[in-house]
Amino acid sequence: MFPRASALAKCMATVHRRGLLTSGAQSLVSKPVSEGDPEMFDILQQERHRQKHSITLIPSENFTSKAVMDLLGSELQNKYSEGYPGERYYGGNEIIDKSESLCQARALELYGLDPAKWGVNVQPLSGAPANLYVYSAIMNVGERLMGLDLPDGGHLSHGYQLKSGTPISFISKYFQSMPYHVDHTTGLIDYDNLQVLAKAFRPKVIVAGTSAYSRLIDYARFKEISQGCGAYLMSDMAHISGLVAANVVPSPFEHSDIVTTTTHKSLRGPRGAMIFFRKGIKSVTKKGKEIPYELEKKINFSVFPGHQGGPHNHTIGAMAVALKQAMSPEFKEYQQKIVDNSKWFAQELTKMGYKLVSGGTDNHLIVIDLSGTQVDGARVETILSALNIAANKNTIPGDKSALFPSGLRIGTPAMTTRGFGREEFSQVAKYIDSAVKLAENLKTLEPTTKLDARSRLNEFKKLCNESSEVAALSGEISKWVGQYPVPGDI
C-alpha cells in the first residue's frame, strides 16, 4: 500500500472509531422528537389535534404559514448575535446580518416608509417588551404617559393600574400613568375628554393603541392632541398590523412618531415584534432652528444592551418571510376577507339579539356585551372551551372585575386563514348562541351554598364536563371544523 493511502486509511479508521465512541451523543442530537422524547411528542400531537378540531376565535391568534414555521425551526436559531448588523459582539455573523437587514428592509417597504425618514428595530421578543423599550428610551422613571384604560379596550402594557392607583402593569410602577376612556354611551374613544386630560396631565407619551376596540382609530386627532401637550405619539398597531399593511384600515405612520407592533396576529408571522421610529427633523423653531428626532440611537440602545442580549435569529428570519408574504395580492385579499367576515359575523350576532360594544365592528374583532344575559364572560369562555371553541372573556366599559367581566372578545383572522366565509361564520354565531343558552341553564344548577366566585366557576366547569348536551355539541363542532385545512396540514 502506498504511504499516502496508508495514512488515509489510518485517518479514516480513527474517524470511524471516534464515530463509534460518540454514537450515543450523535443519536441524542439527530433523533426526531417522536423518538427522542415521546412524552413531549404526545403533547405536541394533542395540541395539533386541538388546533385542527377547534374553532379559534381569539383575535390575537392566527395560523402562520409553513414557510414561517420552516424558519422558526431552522439553523438560524443556533447563532448568537448580540448587537446589530455590522456591529456584533460575536464573530461569524455575516449571514445573520443579511437576514436581519433583509427583515428591516422588507418591514419598511411593506408599510411604504422612506428609509431616510423611518427606521425599524426587529429584535424585540414580543409586543409588551417592545412597548417598555420605547418608554425606557424616551422617558425617565417617573415621567408620564397616557393609554386607553384596560376595561375600555386598552392593553396592560399601556400603563394599566386600578382606579385606586394600584399598579397592575409594572409600567405603571416605573412611570406615572393616566388612562383615557371611551364614551360609555357610544363605545368610541372620547377624544374631547382625552384632549382635556392631556392638557392637564402633560404626558411625555400618548399611546394610540388597543387590544379590544372594534372601531377605527383617528390618528390625525391623536396627533393634534399630542402636539397640543408636547407629547410623543406612539401607536401600537399590534392587532391591526396586517390590516394596515393591506390598506384596509387607516395607517398610523403618517401621524405617529413611533409605531410598535407584534408580528403574529393579523400579520400572520412568528411571535416577534418591531419598533418603527422616525428619523430626521422633528420640528423647526420660530427662529428656524431644526430640532432632530434623535430616536434611533435611543431606541436601539434600549433594545440592546438596555433590555435584551442576543436576538432570536430564527424569529427574525421567519419575520422576513412573513413580511414578504404580506406584500402579495393574496395577502391583501385575505385581510379584506378578515374585515368582511368580521362585519358579517357582527350582523349575525346582532340579529340574534346580542348587544355589541360600540354597536359593531370596523376591523378584525368583536366584543359581545353579555350584561343582558344571565351569564358572564368567564362562564361563556368556559363552556365555549368545552365545546372546542377558543374565545376569551374581556372587560367592557363599566366593568369592575377582570376575572368575571361582562364581555366576550372574538375575532376572524385565524378562521379566515382556514377558509371560513359568511356561511361558516353564520354557523359559528349559532354555536355561540347555543353555548350562551346552555351556560344559562347550567348556571341554575350551581350549588346554592355560599361559595366565592372562583369556587362557583369551578363548579360550573364540572357541570360543563358532566353535561351530555355539551358533550354532543362538542363532538359535532369538532367533526365540522376538522374538515377545514390548517397550514402545513398539522
Swiss-Prot record:
Lineage: Eukaryota, Fungi, Dikarya, Ascomycota, Saccharomycotina
Organelle transit peptide: 1-20
Family recorded in the similarity comment: Belongs to the SHMT family.
Pfam families attached to this UniProt entry: SHMT
InterPro entries: PyrdxlP-dep_Trfase, PyrdxlP-dep_Trfase_major, PyrdxlP-dep_Trfase_small, Ser_HO-MeTrfase, Ser_HO-MeTrfase-like, Ser_HO-MeTrfase_PLP_BS, SHMT-like_dom
Pathway given in the UniProt record: One-carbon metabolism; tetrahydrofolate interconversion
EC number of this enzyme: 2.1.2.1
Top class in the EC scheme: transferase
Alphabetical list of Gene3D superfamilies matching this protein: Aspartate Aminotransferase, domain 1, Type I PLP-dependent aspartate aminotransferase-like (Major domain)
Gene: SHM1
Signal peptide region: none
Function: Interconversion of serine and glycine.
Subunit relationships: Homotetramer. Interacts with NAP1.
Catalytic activity: (6R)-5,10-methylene-5,6,7,8-tetrahydrofolate + glycine + H2O = (6S)-5,6,7,8-tetrahydrofolate + L-serine
Localization per Swiss-Prot or TrEMBL: Mitochondrion
GO annotation, biological process: glycine biosynthetic process from serine; one-carbon metabolic process; tetrahydrofolate interconversion; tetrahydrofolate metabolic process
Transit peptide found in the keyword field: yes
N6-(pyridoxal phosphate)lysine found at: K265
Annotated Gene Ontology cellular component terms: cytoplasm; mitochondrion
Superkingdom assignment: Eukaryota
Main location: mitochondrion
Protein name: Serine hydroxymethyltransferase, mitochondrial
Keywords, comma-separated and alphabetical: Mitochondrion, One-carbon metabolism, Pyridoxal phosphate, Transferase, Transit peptide
GO molecular function terms noted in the UniProt entry: glycine hydroxymethyltransferase activity; pyridoxal phosphate binding
